[in-house]
Amino acid sequence: MDNVLTPEWARSIENIVMSGSYKWGGKSLSMSTNYYPLELPKGLKWGDWEPKSGPNYHWIKKFGHNEKDLIKSGNEWCVQLWEQLFINCNLKEHFNIEEMIDCYVNVHTHGQAPHLHPDNGNFTLLYYPQLNWDYRNWGGGTTIWVPDIDGVENIEKLEILEHVSYKGNRLVMFDGWHWHRPEPVARVCKEARYVVVYKTGKDGGNSERLDYYDN
């Protein structure tokens, strides 16, 4: 869903996110496993298997698992953003989303190769805060796959369900069981790619609603 915040709110969130400090060591996959190296753009062709002793890393800042944690840590903006998304996108009415169970910001730059992975939690929300992101030349979108698989040994069964370009003030939503990944940032891009992530709990709902907010 596009333009989920007012222009003033969107600029405020962009400034807060991009002025933050982030810790190296975020993992897109927590298990040690053999894994595919970087796939070609948008996952249209697989590479060869290569041994790895753990996931690739990126920058991250974790804020907490509920509104109380966020306020206690001085990150009221995370609560305010959550409340705006909850109301503006009708998350309760359309997706039966009840509560936030995790909140953090992921940061990637060119040269990092995020892994495909599923999420914990019932539903994942990704907010793109960078309003001037050049998605046509910089990449950095999000690709989502089906069906649900048990692990990377079945990765060849996956088919692309949706590729969502990085457009500022856009919200991406999907069931947490979907294997997905942030797409690599292009070499010509000298910016870091920031994404605000909320993992949520919901009552019912199903992946067939994924196309409710087709872009």
What is each stretch, according to the model?
Residues 75, 79, 83, 93-215:
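Catalytic core of non-heme Fe(II) oxygenases with the double-stranded beta-helix
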Residues 1-95:
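Non-heme Fe(II)/2-oxoglutarate
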